[in-house]
Regions:
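C-terminal capping/lid segments that line or modulate ligand- or cofactor-binding pockets
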Residues: 19-40, 75-141
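Extended ligand-binding clefts on enzyme/binding-domain cores
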Residues: 1-80
Length: 141
């Protein structure tokens, strides 16, 4: 699709041409290069990431201290989004956030408050903790 003269990957498109600009932390569009769908330098990909991280996107939390992506299910920054960012090369951004957040007493949770970093949903989210550990390891290798 295209918006404001900039092509982007839509989350979904219907037969009438309606589309959604959206991202879901458990299955992020940021992973498209990791699945060899496109290059991380691809203009369409970069436009897409810019759109889902912009202050105009409802779940970006771009102007918050914990500026990661959320979704309607848990409308706060997700730890899975932080892990996604690590795997996509945003290591310093993530390091700064990890130093600020307490999550669920240091255990990964589903989402955190965008200002305080305290757990808002999904306490002791084991699969998220595993994915976060994997992402940290991959990002630091």
């Amino acid at each position: 699709k295209e918006q404001n003269g900039r092509p982007f990957f839509a989350w979904s498109v219907d037969l009438n041409g309606h589309f959604d600009i959206y991202d879901e932390p458990p299955g992020s569009l940021q992973f498209l290069p990791l699945f060899d769908f496109c290059s991380p330098t691809d203009e369409i990909y970069r436009n897409t990431v810019a759109m889902i991280r912009s202050p105009e996107y409802k779940y970006s939390f771009a102007n918050s201290p914990i500026n990661e992506i959320g979704c309607p299910h848990a409308p706060h920054p997700w730890i899975l989004s932080l892990a996604n960012s690590l795997l996509c090369g945003r290591v310093e951004h993530c390091r700064a956030i990890l130093e600020k957040i307490s999550m669920d007493n240091g255990i990964a949770c589903e989402s955190v408050d965008e200002v305080t970093g305290y757990c808002t949903t999904g306490e002791a989210f084991a699969t998220c903790a595993g994915f976060l550990c994997h992402s940290i390891r991959e990002a630091l290798l």
